[in-house]
Amino acid sequence: MNDLPDTRAAAAAGPPPSRATLPAGRLPAYALLDNIRSAWNVGSMFRTADAVGLAGLYLGGVTATPPRADLEKTALGATQTVPWDYWPDAAACARRLRADGLALVVLEQTPAAVDWEAADLPFPHCFVVGHEVHGVAPELLTQADLVVEIPMFGAKRSLNVAVSFGLLAYHVRRRWMRQPPGKGAR
Protein backbone atom coordinates (compact mmCIF):
# COMPACT_ATOMS: atom_id res chain seq x y z
CA MET A 1 0.00 0.00 0.00
CA ASN A 2 0.94 3.66 -0.28
CA ASP A 3 3.42 4.87 2.34
CA LEU A 4 1.47 8.11 2.68
CA PRO A 5 -1.95 7.20 4.09
CA ASP A 6 -3.02 10.84 4.13
CA THR A 7 -2.63 11.04 0.33
CA ARG A 8 -4.59 7.81 -0.15
CA ALA A 9 -7.40 9.25 1.92
CA ALA A 10 -7.31 12.49 -0.06
CA ALA A 11 -8.01 10.60 -3.28
CA ALA A 12 -11.04 8.79 -1.90
CA ALA A 13 -12.58 10.98 0.77
CA GLY A 14 -14.89 13.94 0.76
CA PRO A 15 -16.89 15.72 -1.89
CA PRO A 16 -15.80 16.05 -5.52
CA PRO A 17 -12.86 18.40 -5.95
CA SER A 18 -13.51 22.07 -6.53
CA ARG A 19 -11.23 25.02 -7.24
CA ALA A 20 -11.59 26.02 -3.58
CA THR A 21 -10.48 22.67 -2.12
CA LEU A 22 -7.89 21.42 -4.59
CA PRO A 23 -4.20 21.90 -3.85
CA ALA A 24 -2.56 24.40 -6.20
CA GLY A 25 -2.02 22.99 -9.66
CA ARG A 26 -4.47 20.07 -9.30
CA LEU A 27 -7.31 19.55 -11.76
CA PRO A 28 -10.88 18.74 -10.70
CA ALA A 29 -10.42 15.44 -12.50
CA TYR A 30 -9.59 11.92 -11.37
CA ALA A 31 -8.91 8.71 -13.29
CA LEU A 32 -10.10 5.17 -12.64
CA LEU A 33 -7.81 2.41 -13.93
CA ASP A 34 -9.99 -0.63 -14.60
CA ASN A 35 -8.15 -3.97 -14.52
CA ILE A 36 -4.87 -2.71 -15.97
CA ARG A 37 -2.74 -5.84 -16.05
CA SER A 38 0.71 -4.30 -16.64
CA ALA A 39 2.40 -2.71 -13.64
CA TRP A 40 4.61 -0.76 -16.06
CA ASN A 41 1.51 0.80 -17.62
CA VAL A 42 0.19 1.68 -14.16
CA GLY A 43 3.51 3.30 -13.24
CA SER A 44 3.47 5.31 -16.43
CA MET A 45 -0.06 6.49 -15.65
CA PHE A 46 1.00 7.61 -12.16
CA ARG A 47 3.81 9.62 -13.72
CA THR A 48 1.47 11.20 -16.28
CA ALA A 49 -1.16 11.94 -13.59
CA ASP A 50 1.50 13.83 -11.65
CA ALA A 51 2.68 15.70 -14.76
CA VAL A 52 -0.80 17.02 -15.62
CA GLY A 53 -1.96 17.53 -12.03
CA LEU A 54 -4.85 15.07 -11.80
CA ALA A 55 -6.52 15.17 -8.38
CA GLY A 56 -5.99 11.43 -7.87
CA LEU A 57 -6.15 7.89 -9.19
CA TYR A 58 -8.47 5.02 -8.36
CA LEU A 59 -7.00 1.57 -9.01
CA GLY A 60 -9.64 -1.08 -9.64
CA GLY A 61 -9.75 -4.86 -9.94
CA VAL A 62 -6.47 -6.52 -10.94
CA THR A 63 -4.71 -3.17 -11.41
CA ALA A 64 -1.30 -3.24 -9.74
CA THR A 65 -0.91 -1.12 -6.60
CA PRO A 66 2.21 0.40 -5.03
CA PRO A 67 4.66 -0.54 -3.73
CA ARG A 68 5.97 -2.76 -6.52
CA ALA A 69 9.40 -2.48 -8.10
CA ASP A 70 8.06 -2.84 -11.65
CA LEU A 71 5.44 -0.13 -11.08
CA GLU A 72 7.88 2.19 -9.33
CA LYS A 73 10.39 1.82 -12.19
CA THR A 74 8.09 3.69 -14.58
CA ALA A 75 6.38 5.89 -11.95
CA LEU A 76 9.70 7.48 -10.91
CA GLY A 77 8.35 8.48 -7.50
CA ALA A 78 4.91 9.67 -8.66
CA THR A 79 3.24 7.13 -6.35
CA GLN A 80 4.34 9.45 -3.55
CA THR A 81 2.92 12.61 -5.16
CA VAL A 82 -0.39 11.44 -6.67
CA PRO A 83 -3.20 10.57 -4.23
CA TRP A 84 -4.58 7.09 -4.92
CA ASP A 85 -6.95 4.50 -3.58
CA TYR A 86 -7.55 0.84 -4.41
CA TRP A 87 -11.02 -0.63 -5.00
CA PRO A 88 -11.34 -4.40 -5.65
CA ASP A 89 -14.57 -3.65 -7.55
CA ALA A 90 -14.11 -0.83 -10.08
CA ALA A 91 -17.87 -0.66 -10.76
CA ALA A 92 -18.52 -0.04 -7.05
CA CYS A 93 -15.89 2.70 -7.11
CA ALA A 94 -17.61 4.30 -10.11
CA ARG A 95 -20.99 4.19 -8.35
CA ARG A 96 -19.47 5.94 -5.35
CA LEU A 97 -17.80 8.60 -7.48
CA ARG A 98 -21.05 9.31 -9.34
CA ALA A 99 -22.95 9.49 -6.03
CA ASP A 100 -20.37 12.06 -4.90
CA GLY A 101 -21.13 14.18 -7.97
CA LEU A 102 -18.35 13.25 -10.36
CA ALA A 103 -19.28 12.67 -14.00
CA LEU A 104 -17.94 9.39 -15.38
CA VAL A 105 -16.11 9.80 -18.71
CA VAL A 106 -15.11 6.45 -20.25
CA LEU A 107 -12.39 6.15 -22.89
CA GLU A 108 -13.48 3.26 -25.11
CA GLN A 109 -14.27 2.41 -28.71
CA THR A 110 -18.03 1.89 -28.96
CA PRO A 111 -20.63 2.78 -31.61
CA ALA A 112 -21.91 5.55 -29.31
CA ALA A 113 -18.49 7.02 -28.50
CA VAL A 114 -17.86 10.70 -29.23
CA ASP A 115 -14.58 11.92 -30.73
CA TRP A 116 -12.48 12.93 -27.74
CA GLU A 117 -11.65 16.36 -29.18
CA ALA A 118 -15.30 17.19 -29.92
CA ALA A 119 -16.59 16.04 -26.52
CA ASP A 120 -17.80 18.60 -24.00
CA LEU A 121 -15.93 17.39 -20.92
CA PRO A 122 -17.79 18.07 -17.67
CA PHE A 123 -15.89 19.15 -14.56
CA PRO A 124 -15.46 17.66 -12.03
CA HIS A 125 -15.14 14.22 -13.54
CA CYS A 126 -13.38 10.88 -13.38
CA PHE A 127 -12.17 9.39 -16.62
CA VAL A 128 -11.90 5.63 -16.98
CA VAL A 129 -9.39 3.56 -18.95
CA GLY A 130 -9.58 -0.20 -19.18
CA HIS A 131 -7.82 -3.51 -19.61
CA GLU A 132 -5.17 -3.63 -22.33
CA VAL A 133 -6.99 -6.34 -24.33
CA HIS A 134 -10.62 -6.34 -23.16
CA GLY A 135 -11.10 -2.61 -22.59
CA VAL A 136 -13.41 -1.05 -20.02
CA ALA A 137 -15.74 -3.51 -18.26
CA PRO A 138 -19.39 -3.47 -19.39
CA GLU A 139 -20.48 -2.61 -15.82
CA LEU A 140 -18.55 0.64 -16.11
CA LEU A 141 -19.77 1.44 -19.62
CA THR A 142 -23.38 1.30 -18.43
CA GLN A 143 -22.57 3.91 -15.76
CA ALA A 144 -20.85 6.33 -18.16
CA ASP A 145 -22.12 9.87 -18.47
CA LEU A 146 -19.99 10.21 -21.59
CA VAL A 147 -18.01 7.76 -23.74
CA VAL A 148 -15.14 9.20 -25.77
CA GLU A 149 -12.70 7.64 -28.20
CA ILE A 150 -9.42 8.57 -29.83
CA PRO A 151 -9.84 7.92 -33.57
CA MET A 152 -7.51 5.38 -35.17
CA PHE A 153 -6.26 5.80 -38.74
CA GLY A 154 -3.85 2.89 -39.18
CA ALA A 155 -4.19 -0.86 -39.50
CA LYS A 156 -4.07 -1.29 -35.72
CA ARG A 157 -7.29 -0.27 -34.00
CA SER A 158 -5.93 0.76 -30.61
CA LEU A 159 -3.10 2.43 -28.72
CA ASN A 160 -1.28 1.23 -25.63
CA VAL A 161 -3.46 2.07 -22.61
CA ALA A 162 -0.76 4.24 -21.00
CA VAL A 163 -0.39 6.21 -24.25
CA SER A 164 -4.17 6.68 -24.49
CA PHE A 165 -4.23 7.74 -20.83
CA GLY A 166 -1.52 10.32 -21.50
CA LEU A 167 -3.28 11.76 -24.52
CA LEU A 168 -6.58 12.07 -22.66
CA ALA A 169 -4.96 13.44 -19.48
CA TYR A 170 -3.29 16.27 -21.38
CA HIS A 171 -6.52 16.91 -23.29
CA VAL A 172 -8.34 17.24 -19.94
CA ARG A 173 -5.66 19.69 -18.75
CA ARG A 174 -6.02 21.82 -21.91
CA ARG A 175 -9.83 21.84 -21.64
CA TRP A 176 -9.64 22.93 -18.01
CA MET A 177 -7.23 25.76 -18.83
CA ARG A 178 -9.53 27.03 -21.62
CA GLN A 179 -12.58 27.34 -19.38
CA PRO A 180 -13.91 30.91 -19.12
CA PRO A 181 -13.29 32.80 -15.86
CA GLY A 182 -15.67 31.69 -13.14
CA LYS A 183 -16.00 28.18 -14.64
CA GLY A 184 -12.60 27.01 -13.45
CA ALA A 185 -10.01 28.52 -15.73
CA ARG A 186 -6.56 29.12 -14.37
Q: Which role fits each region the language model picked out?
A:
Residues 1-186:
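Post-transcriptional modification and biogenesis factors for structured RNAs
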